[in-house]
Amino acid sequence: MAVRASFEKNNEIGCFAKLTNTYCLVAIGGSENFYSVFEGELSETMPVIHASIAGCRIIGRMCVGNRHGLLVPNNTTDQELQHIRNCLPDSVRIQRVEERLSALGNVIACNDYVALVHPDLDRETEEILADTLKVEVFRQTVAEQVLVGSYCAFSNQGGLVHAKTSIEDQDELSSLLQVPLVAGTVNRGSEVIAAGMVVNDWCAFCGLDTTSTELSVIESVFRLSETQPSAIATTMRDSLIDSLT
């Protein structure tokens, strides 16, 4: 299921929301309509949390997370941290990170198993990322862009990357992530994929400008038409990975 939405007439909804398989963060303020779009699709399966990070509403660009954990920058206030921690499921760890590249969502892209990071990300941040989110970390670029968190979006089912990503790069990234990738756009031609959409294993939200062609590509590569929130697939994949490692 792919749904269109906008935040105060802004189509870059990936800046104002962070979606994983176990929780969703939505920026405070804004119209109740934006929040209710997420609430309507997700409320039966996960908490939808109003939040700010470091006093900012662009929470999607400030943090990075998956079903195991959430990393936020060091300038996140104690109140913000406590509020998010209280609302998250008990199994999800939240961790503050001292990192020069503090817009973590721009420099890290991840699913529940693998993370792509900016080539200059601090070594300590990489270790915290691997430990808290339980992912394998690769330093990569996407279409020669170092802001990997901005120019791709991927789930455990598939991924969308910058339209100018070469076939060779797509193949390399796909083999690292172990999911199929497609080069494409959102919001009627925008190559800043992660700013224009958020996605998990069964649901995607895109900016209002996203065309029906872009939506059908998204539904296809992320396999949204065939999946429902399911603990079974996750458990099967976890046990398969355990048996391979």
Curated annotation (Swiss-Prot):
Protein keywords: Cytoplasm, Initiation factor, Nucleus, Protein biosynthesis, Ribosome biogenesis
Record's subcellular location: Cytoplasm; Nucleus, Nucleolus
UniProt cross-references to InterPro entries, sorted A to Z: eIF6
GO molecular function: ribosomal large subunit binding; translation initiation factor activity
SUPFAM superfamilies registered for this protein in UniProt: Pentein
Alphabetical list of Pfam families matching this protein: eIF-6
Cellular component GO terms held in the UniProt record: cytosol; nucleolus; nucleus
Gene Ontology biological process terms, A to Z: assembly of large subunit precursor of preribosome; cytosolic ribosome assembly; maturation of 5.8S rRNA; maturation of LSU-rRNA; ribosomal subunit export from nucleus
SMART domains: eIF6
Entry function: Binds to the 60S ribosomal subunit and prevents its association with the 40S ribosomal subunit to form the 80S initiation complex in the cytoplasm. May also be involved in ribosome biogenesis.
Self-association state and partner proteins as the record states: Monomer. Associates with the 60S ribosomal subunit.
Family membership noted in the UniProt record: Belongs to the eIF-6 family.
Record's protein name: Eukaryotic translation initiation factor 6
Source organism of the structure: Danio rerio (Zebrafish)
